[in-house]
A protein has these predicted regions:
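Nucleotide-sugar donor-binding catalytic core of glycosyltransferases
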Residues: 3-295, 352
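Short, hydrophobic alpha-helical segments
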Residues: 315, 348-356
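Amphipathic alpha-helical segments within well-ordered protein domains
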Residues: 311-312, 329
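Long alpha-helical, hydrophobic tracts
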Residues: 274, 314-315
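Membrane-proximal bilayer-interacting regions
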Residues: 309, 315, 339-341
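A charged, aromatic-enriched C-terminal amphipathic alpha-helix characteristic of glycosyltransferases
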Residues: 319-350
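Hydrophobic, well-ordered secondary-structure elements that form the walls
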Residues: 270, 299, 328
Length: 356
């Protein structure tokens, strides 16, 4: 199937438009932070394609400029129910209760989880779970559907309103804030970034204004490229005999270290801003999303054993880089803007229903 045409059937879409989608999440206190990002993206996308949206926490959506109706007292059997448990680390008991509600309903229901720890969480097989950071080399139980951070309507509006230079500065942004469990960034600082800095200007400054501030999008709009990788290395402890009884089963399906927690907002924002986006090679490291970009066409993918190739490309002639940047911008807005993501979600749900 052509990825650009991944949409639910007309009859399925009409049914969802008739009964709507109920987005459930933990308390408003927990859902006002960015853990509700996927719910915001889906709500905006559903509304753009004519699907009514309800929620038990409408204040979370209002905080991002999205108006949704309050959850009805009675939920029709044909209403699609989506539970967002991305805040599982900060409100575990609420998320467990919410997940049980979805699993008990089973029909036309699903969970969302973009938590940093989702790759280590096992789920029942009752309902599908759309998960971030999916890696073919990391095993966890459940009906797991690889999903991507993607673009919110708010982010797209801020990118559209950002100041853009007619000629971008020939530099790369490396603006990661220090944080835990980012061993991939640390390793590449010691190897790739040092090599690239010998040939290209790199802006390593970062701000402390929080996520999605206008200054950041202005910087993206004026820069040639952005380093947008992330994640941490995990290895197979099951290979060590004394750990096997504690682990129970093999979780890392590779003799080499795998990469977890690899997705980031920066990757999507960089692509949509028209930057040359530098990330890990999706195919080389088993990174999974519904529609994958092509290395060298939509982004520049790093292989840790071939960093010199990436340095040569990024420090070379600007015309090929400009083509990659424009291809990446077109790819991300085609597949990962709110409306395409909403269509893709419904197509996936219909396909899962048909397979049962």
């Amino acid at each position: 199937m052509n990825n650009a045409s991944r949409r639910a059937s007309a009859s399925f879409l009409e049914g969802v438009r008739t009964r709507g989608v109920l987005l459930l999440m933990p308390s408003a206190k927990a859902s006002l932070d960015d853990s509700a990002y996927w719910s915001w993206c889906l709500a905006a996308g559903f509304q753009e394609i004519g699907v009514p949206v309800f929620s038990n926490e409408s204040s979370s959506f209002a905080s991002r400029g999205i108006t949704v109706a309050a959850a009805p007292e009675m939920i029709h059997d044909d209403t699609m129910v989506i539970g967002d448990i991305s805040a599982i680390e900060s409100c575990n008991s609420e998320c467990v209760t919410l997940a049980r509600r979805v699993f008990e309903r089973a029909r036309r229901s699903a969970l969302l989880c973009m938590s940093d720890v989702v790759s280590s969480v096992d789920f029942p097989d009752t309902a599908p779970v759309f998960v971030a950071h999916s890696n073919s080399r990391i095993f966890a139980r459940g009906r797991r559907i690889p999903w991507a951070f993607g673009l919110s309507r708010e982010v797209m509006d801020k990118i559209a309103g950002a100041h853009r230079l007619q000629v971008r500065e020939r530099l790369f942004l490396r603006n990661f804030r220090p944080s835990g469990n980012q061993s991939v960034r640390n390793a590449l600082d010691l190897s790739f970034v040092k090599r690239l800095a010998d040939k290209m200007a790199i802006d390593t400054s970062f701000d402390n204004h929080g996520r999605w501030n206008s200054d950041y999008f202005d910087r993206l709009g004026g820069s040639l490229g952005c380093l947008a990788y992330g994640g941490h290395f995990v290895e197979d402890f099951f290979r060590r005999e004394e750990f096997r009884s504690q682990i129970g089963e093999r979780r890392i399906l590779s003799d080499e270290p795998a990469i977890d927690r690899w997705d980031s907002w920066r990757f999507w924002e960089s692509l949509a801003s028209g930057c040359v986006t530098v990330a890990l090679d999706f195919d080389e490291y088993g990174l999974q999303i519904p529609v994958k970009p092509v290395n060298g066409v939509h982004y520049v993918g790093l292989r840790l054993d071939r960093l010199e190739d990436a340095v040569a490309l990024l420090s070379g002639p600007q015309t090929p880089l400009a083509v990659i940047a424009e291809n990446g911008r077109e790819w991300v807005t085609t597949h990962y803007a709110p409306a395409p993501v909403a269509h893709l979600f419904l197509e996936t749900m219909e396909r899962l229903e048909e397979s049962q």
